[in-house]
Amino acid sequence: MFNAYLDTVLDLSANGTVILAKLPEAYAIFDPIVDVMPIIPVFFLLLAFVWQAAVSFR
């Protein structure tokens, strides 16, 4: 079942590249948010450094 889901999300072409599928039309309004979501963990990493700088790297 997971493999069927993965096949709908990812399209593996003949040369092995991964092409991401588009969101369904009902969720098109969330497209800008989905584009930014992979960057959010980087913000948490940077926040950890800012926090440690604020407490003088104790």
UniProtKB/Swiss-Prot annotation:
UniProt similarity note: Belongs to the PsbK family.
InterPro entries (UniProt xref): PSII_PsbK, PSII_PsbK_sf
Compartment list: Plastid, Chloroplast thylakoid membrane
Source species: Staurastrum punctulatum (Green alga)
Record's function text: One of the components of the core complex of photosystem II (PSII). PSII is a light-driven water:plastoquinone oxidoreductase that uses light energy to abstract electrons from H(2)O, generating O(2) and a proton gradient subsequently used for ATP formation. It consists of a core antenna complex that captures photons, and an electron transfer chain that converts photonic excitation into a charge separation.
A GO CC term assigned to this protein in UniProt: chloroplast thylakoid membrane
Listed name of the protein: Photosystem II reaction center protein K
NCBIfam families assigned to the protein according to its UniProt record, in alphabetical order: PRK02553.1
Main location: plastid
Positions of the propeptide segment: 1-21
A Pfam match: PsbK
Complex and partners: PSII is composed of 1 copy each of membrane proteins PsbA, PsbB, PsbC, PsbD, PsbE, PsbF, PsbH, PsbI, PsbJ, PsbK, PsbL, PsbM, PsbT, PsbX, PsbY, PsbZ, Psb30/Ycf12, at least 3 peripheral proteins of the oxygen-evolving complex and a large number of cofactors. It forms dimeric complexes.
Keywords: Chloroplast, Membrane, Photosynthesis, Photosystem II, Plastid, Reaction center, Thylakoid, Transmembrane, Transmembrane helix
GO biological processes: photosynthesis
Transmembrane region(s): 29-49
Topology of the protein relative to the lipid bilayer: Single-pass membrane protein
